Design a protein with these regions (language model features):
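Gly/Pro/Ser/Thr-rich low-complexity, intrinsically disordered segments predominantly at protein N-termini
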Residues: 1-223
Length: 223
């Protein structure tokens, strides 16, 4: 983990004040120990309204009934995403990797996850709103950021949330330990198969993707 990550706040005080200023009536926010929290239980409807009003620089999610803030991607994060897009286009030109995809996740679709990437057939999201149902999403993708919540969010909460709505594959590109982790075979809210691969080794993606990632380039983005 990058030095200082554990102490880094989720957002600057100025951004928090902007967010709190546009919060819907009845949604009370606070900044505690650098984390944004709601003072009262938050409904899905109130979250969606808050997210619509949030400043463009603030990326919000609703995970396990709680408000979460995603870190703004840095340069290496963006380069890794482009690498994945290129790999997908090379092997499966019928598919697209859609960035910053709002997904209805968790049991009963009560969660709202903003996936770094969602792999689906070209044109799949045409006509969709801000948050899409999981049907038709072949793979959810998360690229870890160097923030203190990434362990719980990307390694614990997201696999459960995506498996609960039967997304066939969850791909975690883990920048803390330079691995690519493939989760597959969702069943009863868990992925039955989890395979971890160091950067620089071939990574086989199971059906419905059914192609192999060349991860050698990822070593250029180790930090």
């Amino acid at each position: 983990m990058t030095p200082g990550t554990a102490e880094r706040p989720q957002m600057p005080v100025e951004d928090f004040e902007d967010l709190a200023g546009v919060a819907p009536e009845g949604v009370r926010l606070e900044l505690v120990d650098g984390r944004v929290r709601t003072k009262d239980p938050l409904s899905v409807e109130d979250f969606e309204e808050l997210e619509r009003r949030a400043p463009e620089t603030v990326r919000l999610e609703y995970i396990n009934g709680k408000l979460e803030v995603k870190a703004v991607p840095d340069g290496n994060h963006r380069e890794i995403f482009v690498w994945l897009q290129e790999q997908c286009m090379q092997h499966r030109p019928d598919l697209r990797v859609y960035g910053e995809s709002g997904v209805k996740a968790e049991a009963y679709r009560n969660g709202r996850a903003r996936a770094d990437g969602a792999v689906a057939r070209k044109g799949h999201f045409k006509g969709h709103g801000e948050w899409s149902a999981s049907e038709g999403i072949l793979m959810a993708v998360e690229i870890t950021s160097h923030d203190r919540d990434t362990d719980r969010r990307d390694r614990v909460d997201k696999p459960v949330g995506y498996a609960a709505v039967d997304i066939p594959v969850y791909l975690l590109i883990d920048r803390d330990n330079d691995t690519v982790v493939v989760h597959s075979e969702p069943e009863d809210g868990r992925y039955r198969q989890i395979a971890s691969h160091p950067w620089g080794t071939p990574v086989e993606l199971p059906a419905p993707l059914a192609f192999t990632l060349d991860t050698e380039e990822l070593k250029d983005y180790a930090d």
